[in-house]
Every structure is written in structure tokens, then in C-alpha cells.
């Protein structure tokens, strides 16, 4: 997590917009992408299961400042870094010709990829509950587990749905100049987010049906 002094130094060095810096300093922001002149400020949420445990969902935040010649990321409550993103950019330097927008895409792609194992775990957990849904004497336990799963699925929904809406603006219509060279890549992120969002809605519908069966 960045200290206030570090953010102040970044603001001075890169002429970052004060409102974006304030958001990064306070954290707990809704996923979004905002334009400040010729720069972008993006907020994304990480949803991760820790140490193989699927009964708890750890949510972190990554704030990203994107300018013509720089990309700065600030992590808040996020336990994993993005060395893989740097390695990818170094492994495929020709893609950097698309500018800072490609680095933003690579960061987004890495974050979105981490949603898929969470979805898989949710679906597996739901299947396990469904297998015992008609077993005698399990209704109370089933409902407790279903409501707990519903809560965690909603947390992921709040990470995915706003980001899907925001990223859609980076490949269609008036694309911010900072990302103009990488707009085709953002379409790939939108496709992944739409798939994940659809899976979340399907899981929520199944949970609602299962709760009704147990009532």
C-alpha cells in the first residue's frame, strides 16, 4: 500500500490530478475509469481465495494512473503483485508500440484472469450443496451455506459489473487517446468480463432457486 508521502511524490513527478490521487489515497473505490485531460485513472478490484480456502473471498484494490509515457499502479489490500505483467511486456516488447494503453490492458487482463478460478470454486461449491439439497435434515445447513455463498458471489459481482461497463468505453466510440493504440486488446477484456458476469448471474439464479426449494 502506498504511503501519503509516496503518492505526493508521484503526483509531483507525473503531474497527477489531485482528485485521482485522493481516490488512490483513501481506497475503497468503486471500479471505474476516469479521464483527466490526457491521462486516465482506473480502479479495479481483485477477488482472490487465499491459501486454497474457498469459504472466504479476499478483495483488494488496484488503482492505475496512465499517461502518455507512464503507467503507475497502487495496490490497496492486495496481497499479490504483478510481476507476470512486467515479464509479459518484456517478453513481447513489440506490443509496447501500442503505448501505455497496452500496459493498462495487460494489467486488466491479469486481474480479470484471476476471476476465473473464483467462479470455478463458486460453481463447485454450489454443486456440492445441490447434491444434498433433498437429504433429510439438511435444509437449515443448506440455507446457511447458500446465503454465505450468495454474499460472496455478490462481492464478485460488485467487482465485475462496473468494470465491464467502464472497459467497454475503451474499445468503442470515442476512445481516450492514451488507449487508442490498444483498443482491440480491450475488446478481449470486455469479452472475458461479459462471460464472467454471465456466470455470476447464472450462479445467483441457481442459488435463489435452491433457497426456495429449501424453504
Language model regions located:
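Peripheral, non-transmembrane regulatory/ligand-interaction domains of membrane transport proteins
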Residues: 1-202, 208, 212
Amino acid at each position: 500500500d502506498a504511503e501519503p508521502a509516496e503518492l505526493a511524490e508521484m503526483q509531483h513527478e507525473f503531474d497527477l490530478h489531485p482528485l485521482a490521487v485522493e481516490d488512490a489515497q483513501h481506497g475503497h473505490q468503486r471500479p471505474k475509469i476516469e479521464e483527466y485531460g490526457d491521462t486516465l485513472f482506473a480502479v479495479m478490484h481483485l477477488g482472490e481465495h487465499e491459501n486454497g480456502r474457498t469459504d472466504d473471498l479476499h478483495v483488494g484494490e488496484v488503482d492505475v494512473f496512465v499517461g502518455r509515457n507512464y503507467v503507475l499502479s497502487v495496490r490497496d489490500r492486495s496481497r499479490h503483485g504483478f510481476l507476470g505483467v512486467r515479464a509479459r511486456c518484456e517478453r513481447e516488447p513489440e506490443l509496447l508500440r501500442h503505448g501505455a494503453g497496452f500496459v493498462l490492458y495487460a494489467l486488466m487482463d491479469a486481474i480479470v484472469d484471476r476471476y476465473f478460478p473464483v467462479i470455478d470454486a463458486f460453481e463447485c461449491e454450489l454443486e456440492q450443496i445441490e447434491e444434498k439439497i433433498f437429504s433429510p435434515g439438511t435444509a437449515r445447513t443448506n440455507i446457511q451455506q447458500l446465503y454465505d455463498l450468495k454474499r460472496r458471489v455478490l462481492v464478485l459481482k460488485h467487482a465485475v459489473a462496473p468494470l465491464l461497463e467502464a472497459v467497454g468505453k475503451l474499445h468503442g466510440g470515442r476512445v481516450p487517446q492514451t488507449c487508442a493504440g490498444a483498443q482491440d486488446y480491450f475488446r478481449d477484456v470486455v469479452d472475458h468480463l461479459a462471460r464472467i458476469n454471465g456466470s455470476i448471474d447464472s450462479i445467483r439464479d441457481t442459488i435463489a432457486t435452491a433457497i426456495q426449494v429449501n424453504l
